[in-house]
A protein has these predicted regions:
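Repeated scaffold domains used in trafficking and secretory/extracellular systems
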Residues: 58-66, 103-112, 161-170, 204-221, ...
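Short coil/turn segments that connect the beta-strands within blades of beta-propeller domains
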Residues: 27-29, 68-70, 115-118, 173-175, ...
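A short beta-strand motif characteristic of beta-propeller blades
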Residues: 48-54, 91-100, 149-159, 193-208, ...
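Blade-level signature of beta-propeller repeat domains, shared across WD40, Kelch, NHL, RCC1
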Residues: 325-365
Protein backbone atom coordinates (compact mmCIF):
# COMPACT_ATOMS: atom_id res chain seq x y z
CA UNK A 1 0.00 0.00 0.00
CA UNK A 2 1.23 3.48 -0.87
CA UNK A 3 2.75 5.89 1.63
CA UNK A 4 2.14 9.65 1.71
CA UNK A 5 4.70 11.05 -0.77
CA UNK A 6 7.30 13.47 0.54
CA UNK A 7 7.70 16.91 -1.01
CA UNK A 8 11.14 17.53 -2.48
CA UNK A 9 12.30 21.08 -1.78
CA UNK A 10 14.26 22.86 -4.47
CA UNK A 11 16.43 24.88 -2.10
CA UNK A 12 19.37 22.82 -0.90
CA UNK A 13 19.65 24.85 2.28
CA UNK A 14 16.14 23.75 3.33
CA UNK A 15 16.50 20.09 2.38
CA UNK A 16 17.11 18.72 5.86
CA UNK A 17 14.37 20.81 7.42
CA UNK A 18 12.02 19.93 4.59
CA UNK A 19 12.58 16.20 4.97
CA UNK A 20 11.85 16.43 8.68
CA UNK A 21 8.70 18.46 8.06
CA UNK A 22 7.45 16.04 5.41
CA UNK A 23 7.87 13.11 7.77
CA UNK A 24 5.95 14.97 10.47
CA UNK A 25 3.04 15.32 8.04
CA UNK A 26 2.73 11.59 7.34
CA UNK A 27 -0.80 10.57 8.17
CA UNK A 28 -3.61 8.21 7.33
CA UNK A 29 -7.36 8.60 7.07
CA UNK A 30 -9.68 6.29 8.99
CA UNK A 31 -13.25 5.50 8.00
CA UNK A 32 -14.96 4.24 11.15
CA UNK A 33 -18.45 2.65 11.09
CA UNK A 34 -20.51 3.60 14.14
CA UNK A 35 -23.73 2.74 15.97
CA UNK A 36 -25.43 5.72 14.39
CA UNK A 37 -26.11 6.53 10.75
CA UNK A 38 -22.62 7.89 10.11
CA UNK A 39 -19.20 6.71 9.10
CA UNK A 40 -16.74 8.92 10.96
CA UNK A 41 -13.76 10.23 8.97
CA UNK A 42 -10.76 10.60 11.30
CA UNK A 43 -7.34 12.06 10.52
CA UNK A 44 -4.33 10.53 12.28
CA UNK A 45 -2.05 13.56 12.27
CA UNK A 46 -4.52 15.95 13.87
CA UNK A 47 -6.42 13.23 15.74
CA UNK A 48 -9.58 15.04 14.75
CA UNK A 49 -12.84 14.02 13.11
CA UNK A 50 -12.62 15.82 9.77
CA UNK A 51 -15.93 14.71 8.28
CA UNK A 52 -18.91 12.40 8.58
CA UNK A 53 -20.45 10.32 5.83
CA UNK A 54 -24.21 10.11 6.26
CA UNK A 55 -25.52 6.69 5.28
CA UNK A 56 -29.02 6.03 4.01
CA UNK A 57 -29.61 3.32 6.61
CA UNK A 58 -28.64 3.09 10.31
CA UNK A 59 -25.63 1.28 11.73
CA UNK A 60 -23.04 0.80 8.98
CA UNK A 61 -21.09 -2.31 9.89
CA UNK A 62 -18.93 -4.39 7.56
CA UNK A 63 -16.84 -2.32 5.16
CA UNK A 64 -14.60 -3.14 2.20
CA UNK A 65 -12.33 -0.85 0.21
CA UNK A 66 -12.32 -1.35 -3.55
CA UNK A 67 -9.15 -1.98 -5.56
CA UNK A 68 -9.00 1.62 -6.83
CA UNK A 69 -9.33 2.96 -3.27
CA UNK A 70 -12.02 5.41 -4.24
CA UNK A 71 -15.07 3.53 -2.96
CA UNK A 72 -16.14 1.75 0.20
CA UNK A 73 -18.79 -0.94 0.13
CA UNK A 74 -20.76 -0.89 3.37
CA UNK A 75 -23.08 -3.58 4.73
CA UNK A 76 -25.54 -2.33 7.37
CA UNK A 77 -26.14 -4.18 10.62
CA UNK A 78 -28.94 -6.52 9.44
CA UNK A 79 -26.84 -7.67 6.49
CA UNK A 80 -29.62 -6.97 4.00
CA UNK A 81 -28.59 -3.65 2.41
CA UNK A 82 -25.28 -2.81 0.74
CA UNK A 83 -24.42 0.86 0.25
CA UNK A 84 -21.67 2.27 -1.97
CA UNK A 85 -19.70 5.30 -0.73
CA UNK A 86 -17.73 7.52 -3.12
CA UNK A 87 -14.66 8.67 -1.17
CA UNK A 88 -14.08 11.69 -3.41
CA UNK A 89 -17.44 13.20 -2.53
CA UNK A 90 -17.87 11.32 0.76
CA UNK A 91 -21.43 10.47 -0.10
CA UNK A 92 -23.54 7.39 -0.76
CA UNK A 93 -23.93 6.97 -4.52
CA UNK A 94 -25.79 3.66 -4.69
CA UNK A 95 -27.37 0.83 -2.73
CA UNK A 96 -28.95 -2.54 -3.33
CA UNK A 97 -30.80 -5.30 -1.51
CA UNK A 98 -31.99 -8.78 -2.41
CA UNK A 99 -34.80 -8.73 0.17
CA UNK A 100 -38.35 -8.34 -1.07
CA UNK A 101 -41.77 -8.79 0.53
CA UNK A 102 -41.77 -11.64 3.03
CA UNK A 103 -38.33 -12.85 1.88
CA UNK A 104 -35.26 -11.49 3.66
CA UNK A 105 -31.85 -12.15 2.11
CA UNK A 106 -28.86 -11.59 4.37
CA UNK A 107 -25.37 -11.15 3.01
CA UNK A 108 -22.83 -13.05 5.12
CA UNK A 109 -19.81 -12.28 2.95
CA UNK A 110 -18.90 -10.47 -0.23
CA UNK A 111 -16.06 -9.71 -2.63
CA UNK A 112 -16.18 -6.90 -5.18
CA UNK A 113 -14.49 -7.28 -8.57
CA UNK A 114 -11.75 -4.67 -9.22
CA UNK A 115 -13.84 -3.29 -12.10
CA UNK A 116 -16.60 -2.39 -9.62
CA UNK A 117 -19.16 -3.83 -12.04
CA UNK A 118 -19.95 -7.04 -10.19
CA UNK A 119 -19.62 -8.71 -6.81
CA UNK A 120 -19.71 -12.18 -5.34
CA UNK A 121 -22.17 -12.58 -2.47
CA UNK A 122 -22.58 -15.34 0.11
CA UNK A 123 -26.21 -15.20 1.22
CA UNK A 124 -28.98 -16.93 3.13
CA UNK A 125 -32.66 -16.59 2.34
CA UNK A 126 -35.29 -16.33 5.10
CA UNK A 127 -38.92 -16.72 4.03
CA UNK A 128 -41.55 -15.66 6.56
CA UNK A 129 -44.61 -17.93 6.69
CA UNK A 130 -47.72 -17.75 8.83
CA UNK A 131 -46.16 -19.68 11.69
CA UNK A 132 -42.50 -20.19 10.83
CA UNK A 133 -39.46 -19.04 8.92
CA UNK A 134 -37.94 -21.19 6.18
CA UNK A 135 -34.18 -20.81 5.93
CA UNK A 136 -32.34 -21.67 2.71
CA UNK A 137 -28.68 -21.51 1.82
CA UNK A 138 -25.96 -20.49 2.03
CA UNK A 139 -25.72 -19.68 -1.68
CA UNK A 140 -22.90 -18.08 -3.66
CA UNK A 141 -24.29 -15.51 -6.11
CA UNK A 142 -22.77 -13.36 -8.81
CA UNK A 143 -24.39 -9.94 -8.68
CA UNK A 144 -24.25 -7.28 -11.41
CA UNK A 145 -23.74 -3.98 -9.57
CA UNK A 146 -24.79 -1.89 -12.57
CA UNK A 147 -27.89 -3.83 -13.61
CA UNK A 148 -28.69 -4.65 -9.96
CA UNK A 149 -29.50 -8.25 -10.77
CA UNK A 150 -28.28 -11.72 -9.82
CA UNK A 151 -26.54 -13.06 -12.93
CA UNK A 152 -25.30 -16.46 -11.76
CA UNK A 153 -25.42 -18.97 -8.92
CA UNK A 154 -22.11 -20.69 -8.30
CA UNK A 155 -21.47 -24.20 -7.10
CA UNK A 156 -19.51 -24.33 -3.88
CA UNK A 157 -15.87 -25.29 -4.54
CA UNK A 158 -15.32 -28.97 -3.75
CA UNK A 159 -19.10 -29.32 -3.38
CA UNK A 160 -18.99 -28.31 0.29
CA UNK A 161 -21.09 -25.35 1.38
CA UNK A 162 -19.92 -23.38 4.38
CA UNK A 163 -22.35 -21.89 6.82
CA UNK A 164 -19.68 -19.73 8.42
CA UNK A 165 -16.27 -18.52 7.43
CA UNK A 166 -16.70 -18.54 3.65
CA UNK A 167 -14.08 -16.19 2.22
CA UNK A 168 -13.58 -15.16 -1.40
CA UNK A 169 -11.20 -12.59 -2.83
CA UNK A 170 -10.39 -11.34 -6.33
CA UNK A 171 -6.83 -10.88 -7.52
CA UNK A 172 -5.84 -7.23 -8.15
CA UNK A 173 -6.10 -7.72 -11.93
CA UNK A 174 -9.56 -9.28 -11.59
CA UNK A 175 -8.69 -12.42 -13.52
CA UNK A 176 -8.64 -14.83 -10.60
CA UNK A 177 -11.08 -15.48 -7.78
CA UNK A 178 -9.56 -17.07 -4.69
CA UNK A 179 -11.67 -19.20 -2.37
CA UNK A 180 -10.22 -19.89 1.07
CA UNK A 181 -11.21 -23.25 2.53
CA UNK A 182 -9.11 -26.23 3.62
CA UNK A 183 -7.03 -25.34 0.56
CA UNK A 184 -6.74 -22.08 -1.37
CA UNK A 185 -8.63 -22.68 -4.60
CA UNK A 186 -8.00 -20.37 -7.57
CA UNK A 187 -10.95 -19.99 -9.96
CA UNK A 188 -11.17 -18.23 -13.30
CA UNK A 189 -13.08 -15.05 -12.42
CA UNK A 190 -15.25 -15.30 -15.55
CA UNK A 191 -15.94 -19.03 -15.93
CA UNK A 192 -15.48 -20.02 -12.25
CA UNK A 193 -13.53 -23.10 -13.32
CA UNK A 194 -10.69 -24.21 -11.06
CA UNK A 195 -7.33 -23.23 -12.51
CA UNK A 196 -5.01 -23.84 -9.58
CA UNK A 197 -4.92 -25.02 -5.98
CA UNK A 198 -2.61 -24.41 -3.05
CA UNK A 199 -2.92 -27.42 -0.80
CA UNK A 200 -2.56 -25.86 2.62
CA UNK A 201 -4.44 -28.84 4.03
CA UNK A 202 -1.13 -30.68 3.68
CA UNK A 203 2.11 -29.82 5.54
CA UNK A 204 4.34 -27.39 3.66
CA UNK A 205 7.37 -29.41 4.69
CA UNK A 206 7.78 -33.02 5.91
CA UNK A 207 7.35 -33.37 9.66
CA UNK A 208 5.36 -30.15 10.08
CA UNK A 209 1.73 -29.91 11.06
CA UNK A 210 -0.81 -28.13 8.90
CA UNK A 211 -0.33 -24.33 9.09
CA UNK A 212 -3.10 -21.80 9.62
CA UNK A 213 -2.07 -18.64 7.79
CA UNK A 214 -3.66 -15.22 7.74
CA UNK A 215 -4.24 -14.29 4.09
CA UNK A 216 -5.67 -10.81 4.65
CA UNK A 217 -3.23 -8.02 3.66
CA UNK A 218 -2.62 -5.35 6.28
CA UNK A 219 -2.58 -1.59 5.76
CA UNK A 220 1.19 -1.44 5.26
CA UNK A 221 1.82 -4.79 3.59
CA UNK A 222 3.38 -4.71 0.14
CA UNK A 223 0.94 -5.17 -2.77
CA UNK A 224 0.06 -8.82 -3.20
CA UNK A 225 1.57 -9.77 0.17
CA UNK A 226 0.02 -10.56 3.54
CA UNK A 227 2.08 -10.83 6.71
CA UNK A 228 0.60 -12.21 9.90
CA UNK A 229 0.71 -14.68 12.73
CA UNK A 230 0.20 -18.34 12.03
CA UNK A 231 -0.35 -21.38 14.18
CA UNK A 232 0.52 -25.00 13.59
CA UNK A 233 0.81 -28.20 15.57
CA UNK A 234 4.15 -29.88 16.15
CA UNK A 235 3.17 -33.51 15.35
CA UNK A 236 6.06 -34.96 17.36
CA UNK A 237 5.55 -33.01 20.58
CA UNK A 238 1.81 -32.54 19.93
CA UNK A 239 1.96 -28.89 20.93
CA UNK A 240 0.64 -25.75 19.27
CA UNK A 241 3.31 -23.44 17.84
CA UNK A 242 3.18 -19.75 16.94
CA UNK A 243 5.04 -18.04 14.14
CA UNK A 244 5.00 -15.31 11.51
CA UNK A 245 4.37 -15.92 7.83
CA UNK A 246 4.68 -13.71 4.77
CA UNK A 247 2.43 -15.05 2.03
CA UNK A 248 2.46 -14.21 -1.67
CA UNK A 249 -0.83 -15.65 -2.82
CA UNK A 250 -0.32 -15.35 -6.57
CA UNK A 251 3.01 -17.23 -6.36
CA UNK A 252 1.83 -19.80 -3.79
CA UNK A 253 4.80 -18.86 -1.62
CA UNK A 254 4.97 -18.68 2.16
CA UNK A 255 8.06 -17.55 4.03
CA UNK A 256 7.50 -18.52 7.64
CA UNK A 257 9.30 -19.12 10.89
CA UNK A 258 8.22 -20.20 14.36
CA UNK A 259 8.65 -18.12 17.51
CA UNK A 260 7.71 -20.64 20.18
CA UNK A 261 4.62 -22.12 21.84
CA UNK A 262 1.27 -20.64 20.82
CA UNK A 263 0.07 -17.73 22.96
CA UNK A 264 -3.28 -15.88 23.06
CA UNK A 265 -2.33 -13.09 20.65
CA UNK A 266 -4.88 -11.01 18.77
CA UNK A 267 -4.42 -8.34 16.18
CA UNK A 268 -1.26 -8.10 14.12
CA UNK A 269 -0.07 -4.88 12.51
CA UNK A 270 2.94 -4.38 10.28
CA UNK A 271 4.60 -0.97 10.63
CA UNK A 272 5.28 1.20 7.56
CA UNK A 273 8.46 -0.01 5.89
CA UNK A 274 7.80 -3.64 6.78
CA UNK A 275 10.67 -4.10 9.22
CA UNK A 276 8.66 -4.14 12.47
CA UNK A 277 5.29 -5.44 13.59
CA UNK A 278 3.19 -5.56 16.74
CA UNK A 279 0.53 -7.77 18.27
CA UNK A 280 -1.61 -7.85 21.42
CA UNK A 281 -1.38 -10.49 24.13
CA UNK A 282 -4.75 -10.87 25.81
CA UNK A 283 -5.49 -13.09 28.79
CA UNK A 284 -7.78 -12.51 31.75
CA UNK A 285 -6.31 -9.54 33.62
CA UNK A 286 -3.08 -9.57 31.59
CA UNK A 287 -2.47 -7.50 28.46
CA UNK A 288 0.80 -6.91 26.62
CA UNK A 289 2.17 -5.38 23.45
CA UNK A 290 4.39 -7.85 21.62
CA UNK A 291 7.06 -6.27 19.45
CA UNK A 292 8.55 -8.13 16.48
CA UNK A 293 11.68 -7.52 14.42
CA UNK A 294 10.58 -8.83 11.01
CA UNK A 295 14.00 -8.26 9.45
CA UNK A 296 15.67 -10.24 12.23
CA UNK A 297 12.81 -12.80 12.35
CA UNK A 298 12.40 -12.59 16.12
CA UNK A 299 10.28 -11.25 18.96
CA UNK A 300 12.14 -8.44 20.69
CA UNK A 301 9.89 -7.36 23.55
CA UNK A 302 6.78 -7.82 25.67
CA UNK A 303 5.35 -4.66 27.18
CA UNK A 304 2.49 -4.78 29.72
CA UNK A 305 -0.30 -2.22 29.43
CA UNK A 306 -3.80 -1.68 30.81
CA UNK A 307 -5.61 -3.20 27.86
CA UNK A 308 -9.32 -3.69 27.31
CA UNK A 309 -11.56 -6.73 26.75
CA UNK A 310 -11.96 -6.20 22.99
CA UNK A 311 -9.00 -4.83 21.09
CA UNK A 312 -7.84 -4.12 17.58
CA UNK A 313 -4.42 -2.75 16.66
CA UNK A 314 -3.13 -0.32 14.05
CA UNK A 315 0.25 1.40 13.56
CA UNK A 316 0.38 5.08 12.63
CA UNK A 317 1.52 6.15 9.16
CA UNK A 318 4.81 7.48 10.56
CA UNK A 319 5.35 4.40 12.73
CA UNK A 320 5.60 6.41 15.96
CA UNK A 321 2.26 5.47 17.53
CA UNK A 322 0.12 2.42 18.19
CA UNK A 323 -3.66 2.66 18.21
CA UNK A 324 -5.77 0.29 20.32
CA UNK A 325 -9.45 0.35 19.45
CA UNK A 326 -12.58 -1.75 18.63
CA UNK A 327 -15.89 -1.39 20.46
CA UNK A 328 -16.70 1.64 22.57
CA UNK A 329 -16.11 5.25 21.55
CA UNK A 330 -12.37 5.62 22.15
CA UNK A 331 -8.99 5.03 20.54
CA UNK A 332 -6.06 4.67 22.95
CA UNK A 333 -2.86 6.19 21.53
CA UNK A 334 0.46 4.65 22.63
CA UNK A 335 4.06 5.58 21.90
CA UNK A 336 5.59 2.78 19.78
CA UNK A 337 9.05 3.30 21.32
CA UNK A 338 8.16 3.50 25.03
CA UNK A 339 4.71 1.81 24.88
CA UNK A 340 3.38 4.48 27.22
CA UNK A 341 -0.20 5.69 26.90
CA UNK A 342 -0.08 9.16 25.36
CA UNK A 343 -3.79 9.97 25.36
CA UNK A 344 -7.26 8.65 24.63
CA UNK A 345 -9.25 10.01 21.70
CA UNK A 346 -13.02 10.04 22.29
CA UNK A 347 -15.86 10.11 19.78
CA UNK A 348 -19.50 11.06 20.15
CA UNK A 349 -20.71 7.55 19.30
CA UNK A 350 -19.55 3.95 19.66
CA UNK A 351 -17.81 2.26 16.77
CA UNK A 352 -19.23 -1.04 15.56
CA UNK A 353 -17.37 -4.33 15.52
CA UNK A 354 -17.16 -4.12 11.72
CA UNK A 355 -13.76 -3.48 10.20
CA UNK A 356 -12.29 0.02 10.02
CA UNK A 357 -10.89 1.16 6.65
CA UNK A 358 -7.50 2.87 6.99
CA UNK A 359 -6.02 4.58 3.93
CA UNK A 360 -2.50 6.07 4.10
CA UNK A 361 -2.49 9.74 3.14
CA UNK A 362 -4.31 12.90 4.11
CA UNK A 363 -8.08 13.13 3.86
CA UNK A 364 -8.92 15.03 0.67
CA UNK A 365 -12.09 15.87 -1.22
Amino acid sequence: MSRLSRVTLALAGLAACGAHGARAQETATWYIPTYSQDIVVWDEASEQVVDRIRMRHPIPNETALNESRDRIYVLEATGQIMEVVDLRTRSVIDEFTLSEGNVSVRIDGFAVHPSDDRALLVVKRYTKGRDRYTVEGPFVLEYDLRAKAVTDTLDWPDGKDRDRGADFRYSPDGRTLYFFADDVIALDADTYEEIDRWQLSKPLEPGLGRPNFSLNPGTYDEPGVSTGLFRMTDPIQNRAMLGIATVRLSDKQADFYTLGPAEPLRGFAVAPGGRKAYSLYSDVGQYEFWEFDLAGRRMVGRHPFAGRPRMGLQVSADGSKLYVFVAGNTIDVYDSATFELLRTVSFDEDMTLGNVVVIPGAATR
